[in-house]
Amino acid sequence: MPQVRNPILPGFNPDPSILRVGEDYYIATSTFEWYPGVQIHHSRDLANWELVARPLNRKSQLDMRGNPDSCGIWAPCLSHDGERFWLVYTDVKRKDGSFKDTPNYIVTAEKIEGPWSDPIYINSSGFDPSLFHDDDGRKWFVNMLWDHRRRPQLFEGIVLQEFDPKAGKLVGPRKNIFTGTDLALVEGPHLYKRNGWYYLLTAEGGTGYEHACTFARSRNIWGPYEVHPQKYILTSKDHPHAALQRAGHGDIVDTPDGRTYLVHLTGRPTTQFRRCVLGRETAIQEAYWGDDDWLYVKNGPVPSLWVDLPAARDDTKYWEEKRYTFESGLHKDFQWLRTPETDRIFRTREDGKLTLIGRESIGSWFEQALVARRQTHFSCDAETVIDFSPEDQRQFAGLTAYYCRYNFFYLAVSAHSDGQRELFIMASEASWPLGELRYPVPEGVRIPNEGKVRLALTIRGRELQFYYALEGEELKKIGPVLDASIVSDECGGHQKHGSFTGAFVGVAASDLNGTAAEATFDYFIYRPVQHPSDRYEI
């Protein structure tokens, strides 16, 4: 079989849940504060994937205004019971401190493209929910159980309860069926059944560099569950030089010809600081069932960079330059932050342009006008042309490399207090918890009050450089070289386990006067670049 290099979903695509229906494979991944919620990719061969749905796309399903960074949609589980698709997920409202507010929901659809139902509320006892359809027709709901008292630990275990689809609620007894191993932080549960065994796959160790997939089984769904003889069937925690780090939070799928694969999240750190700019990505491993009825990862437990898959991957689209215009609406590569009310933050135009409506400051947890796409390459270029006439320094719009409020670079068109237009750079560099900005060009660069401005950035590994050009002129540098590796999980806030998204590049607009000043963008270009600084393997 052809060998394919991991990851199969590059860029911010964590917590994969995989499903096969007939000849079709689907992977659902977390989207956190980015709207619409949940990404679902489709493949016929496990190698070539296409984004086909974002199910949580209207106000009656999802409104994340006020959700802090790295809250929102955590760890969706996608399943099919022979009649319809089921999607369970958490909409996290708070993650800091001892408490976590974690309402869990279910939506359903007959077709993967939708329409998806309005959500049914299930519980709030923890996160990472999963739905298991047993062969007797019963449905079982599992999630990790959170204990704010730490008696003995925050991650208390995996709780099981039956779900009644007719009543739309959990019924019957509830039990903590698995408390994990000494690695702790047990989460991400998925149940399976094979040869009379119930199998429980979980994640442990947190989503950083101690991450692992733990496997256990029982003859009874209620337990007790015995742990796999290897304990962790997938992990890179003891191999710091493996190309794929942070391996964990997996799910299992069988092919029609009987092969077994495990998908999992991974991170590819760059620089000596081990920073995952592209966030947590989705990788795949070949697995097999042993004579002892245990699952093993081929060449495991360390994840393989290259994996045998049923087909070769066509990387043509991955490396092609994307020039986006907006006459047909927002391209599916783009998302925005938190709000279902898009008419308040942007509109697409028949002439192909995109207009952003200035709202709150960049980094706001409520209503900011920011439209961006994932950075899916270690090195890339981004470019746009902006038409914007700000009145003062409280109105600004432009081009950004963005992770969260504590973690972004922003080249913006604004105005001095006397109304003269200027360009300036805002840098929020690992600024948690205060969120203070630095201005690499303290006095700004004054520009004419009339005319469009071309804005661009280049990223070459850890080096980010902004550029600008007035109409009829060539691009010129503005500001110093900035540290692009800052726009990463490791610098997004809580540096070990608390930042969960990935780097985006896009456009933004703010009007702190509250007058909804508009900025128009002619196009957006994303250009992948192959550069010697890119480290795909060590």
Swiss-Prot record:
Keywords: Glycosidase, Hydrolase
Activity regulation (record text): Activity is inhibited by Ag(+), Li(+), Cu(2+), Cr(3+), Co(3+), Ni(2+), Mg(2+), Zn(2+), EDTA, SDS and beta-mercaptoethanol; but not by Mn(2+), Pb(2+), Ca(2+) and Fe(3+).
Keyword Hydrolase: yes
pH dependence text: Optimum pH is 7.0.
Pfam assignment, any one: Glyco_hydro_43
EC number in record: 3.2.1.37, 3.2.1.55
Practical use: Combining xylanase Xyn11A and xylosidases Xyl43A and/or Xyl43B leads to the release of reducing sugars as high as 1.29 folds of the sum of that released by each enzyme, which contributes to the formulation of optimised enzyme mixtures for the efficient hydrolysis of plant biomass.
Recorded catalytic activity of this chain's protein: Hydrolysis of (1->4)-beta-D-xylans, to remove successive D-xylose residues from the non-reducing termini; Hydrolysis of terminal non-reducing alpha-L-arabinofuranoside residues in alpha-L-arabinosides
GO molecular function: xylan 1,4-beta-xylosidase activity
Taxonomy, superkingdom: Eukaryota
CDD domains xref list: GH43_SXA-like (cd09000)
Thermal characteristics: Optimum temperature is 50 degrees Celsius.
GO terms (BP aspect): carbohydrate metabolic process
Protein function: Bifunctional beta-xylosidase/alpha-L-arabinosidases with a low level of xylanase activity. Is most active on 4-nitrophenyl beta-D-xylopyranoside (pNPX) (defined as 100%), moderate on p-nitrophenyl-alpha-L-arabinofuranoside (pNPA) (56.6%), and weak on beechwood xylan (5.7%) and birchwood xylan (2.7%). Is able to attack xylooligosacchardies with degrees of polymerisation of 2-5, releasing the amounts of reducing sugars in the order of xylopentose > xylotetraose > xylotriose > xylobiose, i.e. the rate of xylose released from xylooligosacchardies increased with the chain length.
Family membership noted in the UniProt record: Belongs to the glycosyl hydrolase 43 family.
Protein name: Xylosidase/arabinosidase 43B
Species name: Humicola insolens
